[in-house]
Amino acid sequence: MTIAFQLAIFALIATSSILLISVPVVFASPDGWSSNKNVVFSGTSLWIGLVFLVGILNSLIS
C-alpha cells in the first residue's frame, strides 16, 4: 500500500510541475488557449483526481 501511495505522490508532483510550466505558456501564446484548451482541462482533471487519490490512500495508510 505504501508503494501505491508513493507512486501517487510522485504522479501528483510530476503533474503539478508539468502544469506549472505548461499553463502559463498556453495563456501567453496568441493562439494557444483555443488550440490547447482540452489539454489544460485534462491535466487539471488529472491533478484533481490525484489529489483525491492521495487523500484516500493517506487515510488508508494512517
Swiss-Prot record:
It is a multi-pass membrane protein. The chain crosses the membrane at residues 8-28, 41-61. It comes from the Eukaryota. The keyword Transmembrane applies. It is found in: Plastid, Chloroplast thylakoid membrane. The keyword ATP-binding does not apply. One of its GO terms (cellular component) is photosystem II reaction center. Keywords: Chloroplast, Membrane, Photosynthesis, Photosystem II, Plastid, Reaction center, Thylakoid, Transmembrane, Transmembrane helix. It holds the Pfam family Ycf9. GO terms for biological process: photosynthesis; photosystem II stabilization. May control the interaction of photosystem II (PSII) cores with the light-harvesting antenna, regulates electron flow through the 2 photosystem reaction centers. PSII is a light-driven water plastoquinone oxidoreductase, using light energy to abstract electrons from H(2)O, generating a proton gradient subsequently used for ATP formation. HAMAP family: PSII_PsbZ (MF_00644). Belongs to the PsbZ family. PSII is composed of 1 copy each of membrane proteins PsbA, PsbB, PsbC, PsbD, PsbE, PsbF, PsbH, PsbI, PsbJ, PsbK, PsbL, PsbM, PsbT, PsbY, PsbZ, Psb30/Ycf12, at least 3 peripheral proteins of the oxygen-evolving complex and a large number of cofactors. It forms dimeric complexes. NCBIfam families: PS_II_psbZ. This is Photosystem II reaction center protein Z. It comes from Acorus gramineus (Dwarf sweet flag). The lineage of its organism: Eukaryota, Viridiplantae, Streptophyta, Embryophyta, Tracheophyta.
